[in-house]
Amino acid sequence: MARLAGVDIPNEKRIEIALTYIFGVGRTRAKETLAATGISPDIRVKDLTDEQLITLRDYLEANYKIEGDLRREVDADIRRKIQINCYQGQRHRKGLPVRGQRTKTNARTRKGPKRTVAGKKKATK
């Protein structure tokens, strides 16, 4: 397995797909990177030369914020929003959806498993 940006990328996949294993690199950014470095998107990772891997690594590090740097930046942005007490920060703090989604129903991923609350007892006749 080749390593790019501290991530093992699978040998059997096409390089266009394998690059998406790196946090911060999706399909579009992978295509842009390959076009800029002159590497065919159809080539498999195992068929890349060391020179091509070095070119890819240098291009990604020079032009994009990926992996650890990007994760730190995202975490810092969330902490800043929480600290300045803006609406999005309040939603992050409460563990609720941040971007305006409904919460009366759904939002289970963000809210966690359902906690049953005791309700009214039915009146017997």
UniProtKB/Swiss-Prot annotation:
One of its GO terms (molecular function) is tRNA binding. Located at the top of the head of the 30S subunit, it contacts several helices of the 16S rRNA. In the 70S ribosome it contacts the 23S rRNA (bridge B1a) and protein L5 of the 50S subunit (bridge B1b), connecting the 2 subunits; these bridges are implicated in subunit movement. Contacts the tRNAs in the A and P-sites. NCBIfam families: uS13_bact. The keyword Metal-binding does not apply. The keyword Ribosomal protein applies. GO terms for cellular component: cytosol; small ribosomal subunit. Coiled coil: none annotated. Residues 90-125 are annotated as: Disordered. This is Small ribosomal subunit protein uS13. GO terms for biological process: translation. The gene is rpsM. Pfam families: Ribosomal_S13.
